[in-house]
């Protein structure tokens, strides 16, 4: 199908939100020509995308489906530069993310303080997106006919129930539906963006774009094409200038112009959307001139208010009789063949899950809060106290070591994955040149507000005690835990001799061989627990007592290991143009997602969020996509059933079902 040079609607960026926007609008009216421009490659039936269990491959530094942005050095990270990966493939984060189904809290969207963005306004759109593929006690808040599927996947590692029982012993109750928009403290068997019927990842592009293109001819897909700038004519966004995703000839840059008759929607993501606006002349005039760009519209908020969820991992050894995904990820050929064959036979087995089987959302008890520093206590009173639906931290259990398996000994592991739900820290991103290939001036602001440290330290301690109450537990991976003083009772401990021998087998001559006191083995459990029915342990390791030096070791570990959770947002915030308490540098968009100072231009991605959301952000990205598509439809004069914009169901072709299209 030939690509025209003019469209009715142009959607710039085919990520989680952009794919939704383009697919919906192409089904608003099949006489509308909709163009979707994406910098990455097409994800159609790419096994690195649709096979859930191999998602870690997309995070590798040589990934073809992600780009990596390096920040300025930060004293808050002990001088490190943060590395923030962003999807570089059609479908965006939905093609490569962890597939964790997590909703924000009701107060999150109310806190946007924008007309039409309250949770009561957005709930119908949340339901419209999803097909909830499990028994449901809350049918009023979930959807059952949407294009995106939600399930437990088609496999569950045994670490799931062990974690849930251990969490309960920590005062974290099991909850049937932790994504009910109101519960902020509990544990659950975690749902996933996986289609139960096929065992495939449920990404935005297959659900909205490919399904539409197989049934209608009014949606045009332009991949491997980077948005350079938006062209404004007589106060209206009229066209977009693009370049190849990678420079073909730096001395002779290649440009192409696409025009839009009715609407342009910018959806390049939290990092790239503000850069496109800045190259187009929207932003802080001083910064624009310094970068060699003529200011067009004075919007200092463009590129400010950068937010993320701060993440760190804590891996543990597990006993050899338990199952993990380590041998599969490590490259055991026999195991990989068995796992792949099972998935291609019936869509089940370890490839049909992400291995993140259970997790918690938590708020501190009054006693726990009193033990945190005064700065966080004050922040808690201001931000959390009157919003009981907001969790402070999340952590979940991963059924294996999440990281580079060439850097650790063979064996079986589990990993605690933590992230701070509502950081107080803020960052920024700005262009340094009109060149679309130039690296930006990027300060994500990780940990630059002292109030963010206390809950991170608390979560490490909390998750560590959860791990120590699990029957899987066989010691810490000491190289990936804080460097506590040698004499500290909190010191991380390796596997005990019995477990080492079980791994080594009768012919192993070195299991348990220690070099002096370099490492210390785990001691046998000694503490009795009367609550063993729910905790899964009759005998427990005693609670660790941490002193001030131990806390400093944890803080140092967090500064050296905190990273992005791939949940960045906020750089093109909705809010008053003159600014507000939550958008201090001034809003970029009005409540209908229109860019101030120009007609015909909206932004529709996570960058529009003025404040954070307590969830894995694919849920919010889809919601923003649905909301933006509805706003565009209304602006074009459509109403009623037309705004349903129902997309066709994506169906596999015969060749695709056979599994012959493998790697």
From Swiss-Prot:
Reactions listed under catalytic activity: a primary alcohol + O2 = an aldehyde + H2O2
GO molecular function, a single term: alcohol oxidase activity
Organism placement in taxonomy: Eukaryota, Fungi, Dikarya, Ascomycota, Saccharomycotina
Residues annotated as the enzyme's active site: 567 (proton acceptor)
Domain notes from UniProt: The C-terminal peroxisomal targeting signal (PTS) is essential for the efficient targeting and import of AOX into peroxisomes via the PTS1 pathway.
Function: Major isoform of alcohol oxidase, which catalyzes the oxidation of methanol to formaldehyde and hydrogen peroxide, the first step in the methanol utilization pathway of methylotrophic yeasts.
The protein's assembly and partners: Homooctamer. Assembles only after import into the peroxisomal matrix, fails to assemble in the cytoplasm.
Protein name, entry field: Alcohol oxidase 1
Principal cellular location given in the protein's record: other
Family: Belongs to the GMC oxidoreductase family.
Keywords from the UniProt entry: FAD, Flavoprotein, Methanol utilization, Oxidoreductase, Peroxisome
Cellular component, GO, one term: peroxisomal matrix
Gene3D superfamilies: FAD/NAD(P)-binding domain, Glucose Oxidase, domain 3
Inducing or repressing factors: Induced by methanol. Subject to strong carbon catabolite repression.
Localization per Swiss-Prot or TrEMBL: Peroxisome matrix
Pathway: Energy metabolism; methane degradation
Keyword Oxidoreductase assigned: yes
């Amino acid at each position: 199908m030939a690509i025209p040079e003019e469209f009715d609607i142009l959607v710039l960026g085919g990520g989680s939100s952009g794919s939704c926007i383009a697919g919906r609008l192409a089904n608003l009216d099949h006489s509308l020509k909709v163009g979707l421009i994406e910098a990455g490659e097409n994800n159609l039936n790419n096994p690195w995308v649709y096979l859930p269990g191999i998602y870690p491959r997309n995070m590798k530094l040589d990934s073809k489906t992600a780009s990596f942005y390096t920040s300025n050095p930060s004293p808050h990270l002990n001088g490190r530069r943060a590395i923030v990966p962003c999807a570089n493939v059609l479908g965006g984060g939905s093609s490569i993310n962890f597939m964790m189904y997590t909703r924000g809290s009701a107060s999150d969207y109310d806190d946007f303080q924008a007309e039409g963005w309250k949770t009561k306004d957005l709930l119908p759109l949340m339901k419209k997106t999803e097909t909830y593929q499990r028994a449901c006690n809350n049918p009023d808040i979930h959807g059952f006919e949407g294009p995106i599927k939600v399930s437990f996947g088609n496999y569950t590692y045994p670490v799931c129930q062990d974690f849930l029982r251990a969490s309960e012993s920590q005062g974290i109750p099991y909850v049937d539906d932790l994504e009910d928009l109101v519960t902020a403290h509990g544990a659950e068997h975690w749902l996933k963006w996986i289609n139960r019927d096929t065992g495939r990842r449920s990404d935005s592009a297959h659900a909205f774009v490919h399904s539409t293109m197989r049934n209608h001819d009014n949606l045009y897909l332009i991949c491997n094409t980077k948005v350079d700038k938006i062209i404004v004519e007589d106060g209206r966004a009229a066209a977009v200038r693009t370049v190849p995703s990678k420079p073909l000839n730096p001395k002779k840059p290649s440009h192409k112009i696409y025009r839009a008759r009715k609407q342009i929607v910018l959806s390049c993501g939290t990092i790239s959307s503000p850069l496109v606006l800045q190259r187009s002349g929207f932003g802080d005039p001083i910064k624009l001139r310094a970068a060699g760009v003529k200011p067009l519209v004075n919007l200092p908020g463009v590129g400010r208010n950068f937010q993320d969820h701060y993440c760190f991992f804590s891996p543990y050894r597990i006993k050899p009789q338990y199952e993990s995904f380590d041998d599969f990820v490590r490259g055991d050929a026999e195991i990989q063949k068995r796992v792949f064959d099972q998935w291609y036979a019936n869509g089940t087995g370890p490839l049909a899950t992400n291995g993140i089987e259970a997790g918690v959302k938590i708020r501190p008890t009054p006693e726990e809060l009193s033990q945190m520093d005064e700065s966080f206590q004050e922040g808690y009173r201001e931000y959390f106290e009157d919003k009981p639906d907001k969790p402070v931290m999340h952590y979940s259990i991963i059924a294996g070591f999440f990281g580079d398996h060439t850097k650790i000994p063979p064996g079986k592991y589990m990993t605690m994955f933590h992230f701070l739900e509502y950081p107080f820290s803020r960052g920024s991103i700005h262009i340094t040149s009109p060149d679309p290939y130039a690296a930006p001036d990027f300060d994500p602001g990780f940990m630059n507000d002292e109030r963010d440290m206390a809950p991170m330290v608390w979560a490490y301690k909390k998750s560590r005690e959860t791990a120590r109450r699990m029957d899987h537990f066989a010691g810490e991976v000491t190289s990936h835990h804080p460097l506590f003083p040698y004499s500290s009772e909190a010191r991380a401990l390796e596997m005990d001799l019995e477990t080492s021998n079980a791994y080594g087998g009768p012919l192993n001559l070195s299991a348990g061989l220690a070099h002096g006191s370099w490492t210390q083995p785990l001691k046998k459990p000694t503490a009795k627990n009367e609550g063993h029915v729910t905790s899964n342990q009759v005998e427990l390791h005693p609670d660790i007592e941490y002193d001030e030096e131990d806390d400093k070791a944890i803080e140092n570990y967090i500064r050296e290991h905190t990273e992005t959770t791939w949940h960045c947002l906020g750089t093109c915030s909705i809010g008053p143009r003159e600014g507000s308490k939550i958008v201090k540098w001034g809003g970029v968009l009005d409540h209908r997602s229109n860019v101030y100072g120009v007609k015909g231009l909206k932004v529709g991605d996570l960058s529009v969020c003025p404040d954070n959301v307590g969830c894995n952000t694919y849920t919010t990205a889809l919601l923003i996509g649905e909301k933006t598509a509805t706003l565009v439809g209304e602006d074009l004069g459509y109403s009623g059933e037309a705004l349903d914009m129902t997309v066709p169901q994506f169906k596999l072709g015969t060749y695709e079902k056979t599994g012959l299209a493998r790697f």
